[in-house]
Amino acid sequence: ITNMAEKMDAKLDYANQKVEQVIDTNRKLRVGIIGCGWIADAHIDSYKRMPDVELVAGCDLIPGKAAAFFKRNGVEGVKTDYASHKEMLDDESLQLDAVSICTYNRQHAAPAIYALSKGVNVLLEKPFTVTLDEALEVMKAEKASGKVLSIGFQPRLDPNMQMIKKIVESGELGKIYYIQTGGGRRRGIPTPFPEV
């Protein structure tokens, strides 16, 4: 992992990058959702509780899925007649400020790169990407765009992780030479899927 981080730092000089944005607080943040599967439910629930956010668009590769998703979640007036993320992001009438990318793992990089290239901030579901090369490309796109790329990686806030961190930092275990951990998820990593 250290080698990967060093490669990324060397190629991107990320530590010296400063991102500043001015946001007009007199209007709502206009947000779109790319990928309307099960993880998008968590995103829409959060957005619905934010008074300064307006959900304006959504798309999914499965025709009709985005419209059904927003209807099921009680959100009206959302434009969903897009066949792809590119079509949605190319619609300048939306005036998107940000998108949540809730696609399959293998489909994270392309929409993130395209959104950033269109000047749209990105909230990207974990995992960031599935390869180092994709990660580097997404980070280059962020740097070139001056927009914000945020990775939704919340396990660090999990009470179990916090407890482990506290124990390790306390020194109670002495000097740690090796740790092995594992995890899983119900659905696994869905592959292969077509490039988008």
Each predicted region: which residue ranges?
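N-terminal Rossmann-like dinucleotide-binding module
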Residues: 5-76
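Short, Asp-centered acidic motifs that coordinate Mg2+ and/or phosphate
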Residues: 57, 98, 178
